[in-house]
Amino acid sequence: RQRQMCIRDRQLLNRQQELSISKSSAIGNVRIIDPAVTQPQPVKPKKALNVVLGFILGLFISVGAVLARAMLRRGVEAPEQLEEHGISVYATIPMSEWLDKRTRLRKKNLFSNQQRHRTKNIPFLAVDNPADSAVEAVRALRTSLHFAMMETENNILMITGATPDSGKTFVSSTLAAVIAQSDQKVLFIDADLRRGYSHNLFTVSNEHGLSEYLAGKDELNKVIQHFGKGGFDVITRGQVPPNPSELLMRDRMRQLLEWANDHYDLVIVDTPPMLAVSDAAVVGRSVGTSLLVARFLSLIHI
């Protein structure tokens, strides 16, 4: 029996060797036809195509947004829109490219470390560039107002706007300078006790102004300053009070306007926007003429 087991083991070993030899000598049926080719560029994303499509899509979206804004924003586009509602238009004042360029340059200089840019070299169009088309339009406004104010009860002119940044201070200050150039005595009162900036425009002190006078802290001789560059007198707004409307309702405001009416050929009062606060309505009770400044496309369509 032991001999049989030895014979069987020998047969298994022989069979294993035969299989190993057969496996080593077997020829496979797989062969390489072409070597693999590597692609140096990515298949996706296609950057050039995406950039072109993105540019075209962005262009369409931008044009659509501009058209939608133009259609939804209904503002005053022409004087005829106001005249159709019985509102008299005294002048149309174009934007001054000269002033706009220098204003943008000064805003850049505000970030400079040089303090002089904050208080000096502020352009005043009526004096620095009197031949500008905007100044010529204000001269036409002066002529129109001269005839319009001939039958009014006093020579006090209130200039206001419908909304902030309507250009009322530009119109009022330029008008004051233009009228002063015709040898008339003019007083400019900055009654915008919240955001008035005439002291920066005229480069005068704002320590003693209208708010101090109305509060009883200062007298008239202390708050009236002369703006030599423009040739007229100025009352700045003073320090910002906590109750502007209440100050303007005091008798001292009425007394100031009555005194100014007797001592000046024209009194120009620059007030806050009439749709924002009630200050303009308060001052309007004591003036003979009111002028509303409507900026192009900024006033909601009537």
Predicted features along the sequence, with ranges:
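Non-transmembrane alpha-helical coiled-coil
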Residues: 1-4, 8-35, 40, 79
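Residue-level signature of catalytic and energy-coupling elements of molecular machines
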Residues: 12, 32, 82, 141, ...
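Conserved helix-loop functional segments at active or binding sites
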Residues: 14-22, 143-151, 266
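Soluble periplasmic/extracytoplasmic beta-strand elements of cell-envelope proteins
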Residues: 30-34, 90-92, 156-158, 233-236
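Membrane-interface helix-start motif
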Residues: 38-51
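Short boundary/hinge segments that flank catalytic cores
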Residues: 52-185, 191-211, 222, 241-245, ...
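Conserved catalytic-core segment of NTP-binding enzymes
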Residues: 73-83, 203, 215, 225-228, ...
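Hydrophobic anchor at the start of a short beta-strand
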Residues: 89-90, 186, 267, 290
